[in-house]
């Protein structure tokens, strides 16, 4: 076999081996996606209950429904204060092979920093995932907290420390507001990069929650009640307990959402790699067939020429 044919054949075999790997990785990512979607659906039931009760309590507790930014009785997680420093909790992956997942989240963060005039002097980073931590540390940013090694389906117990730390640093006035930057899962082929304010809890955020609750229906088609609760011993005591839980549910929910998007992005990246491998194999196979045909034609011509010369 000519050297050129042997080289093409080796490339075909190598590409086929790579395709087997990417195809297997796609299947694994898809399985992880299905698993975390089931977990998220279960968690969402709890989160929605917390949101519904909180909206009801705030509306009954605040003198002017959901206009509470200066109502200190609702707690420091609601009260606005002058912004001297901004905290950003950015969620990325620990590894690559996730397509544009990490780069898009980082771009969204940088765009928000530019929009708000944020820099290394007035920004404090908390990072979930090695990629984001390394990116911002290399650029001289203040990374106050790092969390790596998030499992494929993170439990609240696993990420409890980062959730508590994000809230505690705000309460300790290390920063005066907290953004969270992550990739929101839309569907298996689409995601949306978000950089949203988490703390202080905003009126707009609760109004949106209130609207979602109002549009939600129970399994029998009856609207889910969001405002009829009897609270003991007092609204204030319940708010003291519920407001931190609400903030924690927002942060943990974003981590679950980001991990779901990561698995979807990984599955799509591996699917794209497998498709590209198929295209390369087809092209190489065509080259191989043409080269083989040319080699056969050359051999026939040489044999025919030799026989003619003998005559």
Swiss-Prot record:
Signal sequence annotation: none
The keyword Ion transport is annotated on this UniProt entry: yes
GO molecular function, one term: ATP binding
Gene Ontology, cellular component aspect: plasma membrane; proton-transporting ATP synthase complex
Membrane topology, record value: Peripheral membrane protein
Entry keywords, A to Z: ATP synthesis, Cell membrane, CF(1), Hydrogen ion transport, Ion transport, Membrane, Transport
Pfam (any one): ATP-synt
Single biological process term from Gene Ontology: proton motive force-driven plasma membrane ATP synthesis
Localization (cell): Cell membrane
Subunit structure: F-type ATPases have 2 components, CF(1) - the catalytic core - and CF(0) - the membrane proton channel. CF(1) has five subunits: alpha(3), beta(3), gamma(1), delta(1), epsilon(1). CF(0) has three main subunits: a, b and c.
Family: Belongs to the ATPase gamma chain family.
Function per UniProt: Produces ATP from ADP in the presence of a proton gradient across the membrane. The gamma chain is believed to be important in regulating ATPase activity and the flow of protons through the CF(0) complex.
Record protein name field: ATP synthase gamma chain
Organism of this sequence: Limosilactobacillus fermentum (strain NBRC 3956 / LMG 18251) (Lactobacillus fermentum)
């Amino acid at each position: 076999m000519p050297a050129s044919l042997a080289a093409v054949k080796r490339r075909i075999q190598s590409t086929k081996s790579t395709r087997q790997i990417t195809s297997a990785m796609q299947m694994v990512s898809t399985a992880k996606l299905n698993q975390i979607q089931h977990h998220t659906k279960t968690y969402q039931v709890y989160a929605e209950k917390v949101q519904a009760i909180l909206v009801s309590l705030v509306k009954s507790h605040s003198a002017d429904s959901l206009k509470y930014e200066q109502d200190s009785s609702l707690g420091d997680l609601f009260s606005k204060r002058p912004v001297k420093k901004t905290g950003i909790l950015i969620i990325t992956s620990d590894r690559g092979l996730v397509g544009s997942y990490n780069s898009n989240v980082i771009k969204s963060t940088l765009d928000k920093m530019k929009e708000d005039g944020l820099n290394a002097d007035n920004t404090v980073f908390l990072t979930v995932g090695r990629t984001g931590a390394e990116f911002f540390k290399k650029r001289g940013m203040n990374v106050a907290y790092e969390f790596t090694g998030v499992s494929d389906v993170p439990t609240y117990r696993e990420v409890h420390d980062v959730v508590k730390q994000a809230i505690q640093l705000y309460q300790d006035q290390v920063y005066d507001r907290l953004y969270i930057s992550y990739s929101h899962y839309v569907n298996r082929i689409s995601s949306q990069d978000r950089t949203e304010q988490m703390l202080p809890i905003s009126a707009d955020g609760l109004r949106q929650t209130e609207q979602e609750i109002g549009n939600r229906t129970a399994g029998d088609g009856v609207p889910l009640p969001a405002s009829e609760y009897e609270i003991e011993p007092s609204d204030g005591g319940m708010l003291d307990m519920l407001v931190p839980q609400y903030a924690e549910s927002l942060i943990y929910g974003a981590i679950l959402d980001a991990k779901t998007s990561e698995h979807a992005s990984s599955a799509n990246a591996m699917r794209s790699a497998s498709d590209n491998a198929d295209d390369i194999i087809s092209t190489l196979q065509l080259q191989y067939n043409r080269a083989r045909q040319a080699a056969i034609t050359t051999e026939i011509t040489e044999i025919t020429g030799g026989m003619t010369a003998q005559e």
